[in-house]
Amino acid sequence: MNPITSPANPTVKHAHALLTQHRTRKKSGQTVIEGVHLLDAYLNQGLTVTTVIVSQTASEHPEVMPLLGQIDTTKITIITDSLYKQIRSLGDGVDIMAVIDIPKHHLGQITGDCLILDGLQDTGNIGTLLRTASAVGITTVITTPNTAHLWSPKCLRAGMGANFALQIFEQIPHDEIFAKVKTPLYATSSHTDKVIYHHNLQNPIAWVLGHEGQGVSQQFLAQATAIALPQPNGQESLNVGVAGSICFYEMLRQRQYG
């Protein structure tokens, strides 16, 4: 098979638009995962790709060949190394990407543990929270309007595959969240003296974590139990990714380790 050389190729053009344009991802309901690790994590969940784009050199890479073997050959597009470098967003790594359909889930009544991201923007923090939530067994994630898109290529890379194991509901208005989430809300706050270690976290919890600068919105604070994380050295606040991870693991400790 001769590799594609033109950036005007429809498959290449579409993938590049998905990588760079939120409106294209929103309109098509698709996104792009880049690199061997993410593609492997995606396939390991039993999920199906729409298209794979791989550079000519990478198509013979020992980590890539087993992955390509799991994919219908009609879905594989080989392009020249120089063309791949024009469209990729990763600066290094093995040159392979896949176009995938963004999963669509219906938000029903939530009675178990869940994570609510309220206006978070930093992809690093979001990735940390998704990975940690998945690690402790939280499987449902809800975002409010104005939260970063969890299926953007940057968030996908930061999540390192956690997205594929989670049920994600994005851009859900506050009133719908209050109507659907029956689990008690807990929110980190600097305006309470009751630290997390004095709370009973044995029962299902809906963790609310807010914007990096503004914190959790007043709509949630009015409905949630506020908890504090002890900071004896007087730091003003913790990184939200770190704060959320501490909460999740204290919950896990109480439930499984007494």
Which role does the model predict for each range below?
Residues 44, 99-192:
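RNA substrate-binding interface of SAM-dependent RNA methyltransferases
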